[in-house]
């Protein structure tokens, strides 16, 4: 596996010249490419953990740690005059949960991946599940937290399901997140379903 510096140089870039935002998106690609060839855990018994929310938090540091390269990447950034904590600050907070049960669900799927248990989390892909508070004209207002960007940890799939209602049908599509266990050769998935806005009269 190439180092992050080699990965950056292969794209004809110099780590010292990049902004924290540019470094973050390159690290995102670097980690996803490292995780992509890992096979899905396919042991005979399988656990499905279904939850309305998964409070997974930011994923960059956790994925670097689980791949066993956090210290190496941190040192490479420091050698280039960059701070990994400042790069981590660029990452948007996934709006997939905001409570203790969501945190518990995330801990379970992380633990299953690290213990080598074949398991998948199943939940909803909230595009604006959290909100941020801002002040306008000396008044506090809530704004949606748009966390899904063109480049994100989400891996799109071709899987979809029709969900019929009385007067209309929604198509639910499936995206997933790779859940990496600590220094494991296999991975699990967090499967997230979403739809387009429902039709209104």
Where on the chain are the PLM-derived regions?
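Generic, well-ordered alpha-helical scaffold segments in large soluble proteins
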Residues: 30, 34, 76, 107-111, ...
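Conserved oxyanion/phosphate-binding beta-strand-loop segments in alpha/beta enzyme cores
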Residues: 31-88
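Glycine-rich phosphate/pyrophosphate-binding loops
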Residues: 109-110, 114-132
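Conserved small/polar residues in nucleotide/adenosyl-binding loops
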Residues: 194-201
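N-terminal-proximal low-complexity accessory segments that begin disordered
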Residues: 1-36
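Extended, Lys/Arg-enriched charged tracts that mediate electrostatic binding to polyanionic substrates
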Residues: 129-193
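Glycine- and acidic
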Residues: 12-17, 86-96
